From Swiss-Prot:
Signal peptide: none annotated. Its main location: cytoplasm. Keywords: Cytoplasm. Modulates RecA activity. InterPro entries: RecX_HTH_1st, RecX_HTH_2nd, Regulatory_RecX, WH-like_DNA-bd_sf. It comes from Thermotoga maritima (strain ATCC 43589 / DSM 3109 / JCM 10099 / NBRC 100826 / MSB8). It is found in: Cytoplasm. GO terms for cellular component: cytoplasm. Pfam families: RecX_HTH1, RecX_HTH2. Belongs to the RecX family. Gene3D superfamilies: Winged helix-like DNA-binding domain superfamily/Winged helix DNA-binding domain. The keyword Thylakoid does not apply. This is Regulatory protein RecX. HAMAP family: RecX.
Length: 161
C-alpha cells in the first residue's frame, strides 16, 4: 500500500476521535454562536454522550466562561429586538421555549430595552404604513406592549414636527 492509498483509507480517523470527546464537540458548537445551557445539554445528549460526561462538560465550560445563560439571553434579546424588531413579549416567549430561567429572561430584556433606541428604527418603518393605526397593529403583533407603542409613536410624531 502506497502513501496515497493509506492516506485515503485513514482520512478523518483522527478527526472522528476528537469529535467523540464531549468538550471538543461542545466547543465546536460554541464556535459558531453563543448557546444556552439547556440547548447545549440537549445537543450533547443527542450526540450520545453519557449524562456524567455531559454534566462535567457543562460545568467545565461554565468555569471557563464559555457558557453563560445570562449573557446569551441578553445577546439573544438584543438581536431579536434590534435586528428583527420583535418586542419584549415575543422575545420572552422565544427565550422560554429555549429553556432559559424566568429571572434571567427579565434581566436580559430590561438590559436590552435600556440599550436599544426603537425611535430611530421605527422612523424608517413609518414610511411603509399608511397611517398610525397600521403601524400600531404591526408593533402589537411583533410583541410590543400598548403603553410602549404609544410612547414610541408619540416620540416619533413629536420629533418630526
Amino acid at each position: 500500500m502506497d502513501y496515497y492509498q493509506w492516506r485515503k483509507k485513514n482520512r478523518g480517523k483522527k478527526r472522528n476521535l476528537q469529535a467523540k470527546k464531549p468538550l471538543n464537540y461542545a466547543l465546536r458548537l460554541l464556535k459558531y454562536r453563543v448557546r444556552f445551557e439547556d440547548e447545549l445539554r440537549e445537543r450533547l445528549k443527542k450526540q450520545g454522550f453519557a449524562d456524567e460526561e455531559v454534566e462535567s462538560t457543562i460545568t467545565t465550560l461554565k468555569k471557563q466562561g464559555y457558557l453563560d445563560d445570562e449573557k446569551a439571553a441578553y445577546l439573544f434579546a438584543l438581536d431579536e429586538m434590534r435586528l428583527k424588531l420583535f418586542g419584549p413579549r415575543v422575545v420572552k416567549m422565544k427565550l422560554k421555549s429555549l429553556g432559559v430561567d424566568e429571572e434571567i429572561i427579565e434581566r436580559a430584556i430590561e438590559k436590552a430595552l435600556e440599550e436599544i433606541d426603537f425611535h430611530e428604527e421605527l422612523k424608517r418603518l413609518k414610511g411603509r404604513f399608511k397611517d398610525r393605526w397600521e403601524l400600531r397593529d404591526y408593533l402589537y403583533r411583533r410583541g410590543f406592549d400598548s403603553s410602549l407603542i404609544e410612547e414610541i409613536l408619540n416620540k416619533i410624531d413629536g420629533g418630526e414636527e
